[in-house]
Amino acid sequence: MDLINKNVESIDPAMVTQIRLADGTLMPQAAMGTFHSDNPDLEAAMEDVITEAIRLGYRHLDCATAYQNEEVVGRAISKAIESGLVIREELFVLSKLWNKNMKPEEVIPALDQTLKDLGLEYLDMYLVHWPWPNYHEPGSAGDVVNTHAVPYIHEDFMKVWEKMTELKKSGKVKNIGTSNQTQKTMELLLRDTDHFNRPSYNQMELHPLFQQQDFVKYLISEKVVPSGYMSLGSPRRPGRDRFAEHQADMLHPIIQQVAGETGMTPPEVCLSWAHQREQNNVGYVAMAERSEWIKSNLACATKEALSNNQYIKINGDGSDENLGINTNNRLIWGQVFFWPEARLLGHDRDMLWNDVQIFETELDYHKFRQAAVKFYEIWKETAVDLRIKYS
C-alpha cells in the first residue's frame, strides 16, 4: 500500500488554530509527530512522510534526539524548503534534550548536534525531555534496569535549566519548555525561575481516557501551554509500554458513539476533543504515515466538530456527577526509568508520577537512600512474604 497520495488536497495552514505562548509567539496547535514507535517500516518512510505532512499543511514538527531520526527529519525539511513548499520562518520546529545529556556541560553540545542533524540555525522550542538523567537505550525491553537512575532532584534539574536559559539568550532556541513534568516538579521550577526564564510549554501524556484535567488547568493558569502526546491512545506504542490493564481510547463506547453521530472516525473524535479543550488552548501531537490520515489529523485543528453535548460526554462538565470518560488510563508507566529505591520499596505503576520521592538537594536524597537501604534490610528479615522469598 502506497503511503503518499499526491491527489490529497492540502489544508491552508492559516486555517489551523494557533496558540499564543507567553512571549507572544504563535504556535500551531497540531503538531506532526516524528516518533516511529521502534517500527522499522515507518522509520524507513519517515523522510517522505514528513515532507508530505508539510505539503498537506503541517507547520509544527515534534522532534527529539531520542527518536534517532533528526537527520531524516532534517532532510525532509530541507526538501520542503528547496521545493518551495514552505520557508523556514513558517515552520515551528520543536526538539527535546535527551536524558543521556542531562549534565550541565552536555546541554549546549546536545542542542548543537540537534541543529546540525536538522539542518537548522535555530529551534522554535527546545524541551527537557524528562526531568532527570535516567534513560534507556532505544528499543529497550520493558524490564531493563538502569542502575544509575535517580529520582527527581531539584538542584540538579535547575543546573540543566540554567543551561536551557543560556540557549534561549543565545538565540539558538526561541522558547524553552519541559516534558513529562508532574505538577509538583513544575511548581518547584516556576518557584525558582524569573519571568524571562520560565518554561512556556509542557508536553505530557493526554488522551480521552487520561485527561489530567487539574494539571492542564494549573499550567494554563501559569501561562504554560500544555500539549499532549499519545493523543490517540498510541495504539502502536512499543511493547515496553503495553500492559494488560490498559484500555484503548478509540474503542471506548462513547468515542464510538460520537463517531457514529458525527460521521467522523474514532481518531478524529479523539483529536477534535483535544482541539476543543480549554477554549482551544491545549496542543496535541499526532503521528500518521498515510496522506489521508495526516490530513484528517491536521483538519481536526481547523473546526469545532463536536457539539457541546458530545464534548461533555468525553470531557465531563466539572461536576462529580459527570466526569466524562477519563479513567486515569496512563499508558507511560515509565518503569524503565525507575531508580533503585523505587524498586526497593515496593514500587507501583504510579511511582514515577506520584511525587512521593522527589528531593530538593542531592544531600536530601543521600539521606533518604541510606535510610531506605536500612529499612529494606529490616523489612526483608521480618516481613513474612519477603522472608520466604529470600530464604
What do these predicted regions represent?
Residues I11-I19, I77-S78, L111, Q183-L189, ...:
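Alpha-helical scaffolding within the catalytic cores
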Residues V107-V128, E166-L167:
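CE4/NodB-like, metal-dependent polysaccharide N-deacetylase domain
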Residues I87-N101, M125-P131, Q203-L206:
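A short, structured active-site edge motif that brings together acidic residues
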